[in-house]
């Protein structure tokens, strides 16, 4: 069962995420170690928005609170009574989807993944607890393993040789592991690394093992489902966890063994065997950037309204390119690539940090294949 401190961490991380949505120095919010002070410093609009988010997470009407402590007490009581948390997908237009998970589902998932982490002595969390990935592996998993959790800011340049201990499970995300690999730091002994939220390049997984990582686990799942499958090595398909039943006919469907509702796999995938799958991913509609759901069509709509832009396309980078968005632009007459600066300035005023494309490519027409269909670049 969750404790009041667990609820406090969930709400504190949700608060930080709300503040980070509109700040260029987003990481500084997550380094802040006094969430009560962050709460007290909220503007009226920010507090109203956060109170709405908190209410939706615990399936309650939005309610005003004078302090973070009062909010924690109220929603801890709500959780004890209803046994439910809605995990919210982080939409880019202000709307989000509620993904309800009951305490039965939480317990089933935590116990269902437990066997993967035998020998773990401590969990080091680099991810927020209000998203399902962070919740499952840094809130619920420590309870079933009987180990402590330490939450640290995800700074690749930190002195990890001193911060980590043998037997640690480091719960991270693709961008952090990419930075680690680029820095070329060797891992301390007996470190287990975990990753989810978006696909990891096989070359990156191999590189982490070259840096003396003891064990790597990549989780495939979604906010709607929770953890579905895992893999440990490059070029492997994902093995489905035992608490899922799979129907591979036509569209791949799955359901929890404790439940009765079948649902379609959240991504396109192909089956290697009855319980092994290879996700093919979503590249155009909803993607994740640093753990936040981002919608490329929304970014395209904003970008297309700039007078310099005749046509544009926005996609998630391929794993070997990075973990941000990229944009392809066809310019109107009278504009050239030297106008990229004004386009960037315009976008920074309209988009969140996670929505901002990291790279821009220019050309006379949008990329298409021989059949005239849109293609990557």
What are these regions (language model features)?
Residues 1-27, 53, 87, 119:
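Thiotemplate assembly-line natural product biosynthesis machinery
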Residues 24-57:
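Phosphopantetheine-attachment site and its flanking helix in carrier
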Residues 61-74, 351-373:
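AMP-binding/adenylate-forming catalytic domain of the ANL superfamily
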Residues 86-98, 223-224:
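Conserved adenylation A10 loop of the ANL superfamily
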Residues 100-113, 122-179, 192:
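AMP-binding/adenylate-forming
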Residues 181-236:
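Gly/Ser/Thr-rich phosphate-binding loop
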Residues 244-270, 275-277, 330:
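AMP-binding/adenylate-forming core of the ANL superfamily
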Residues 266-355:
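AMP-binding/adenylate-forming catalytic core of the ANL superfamily
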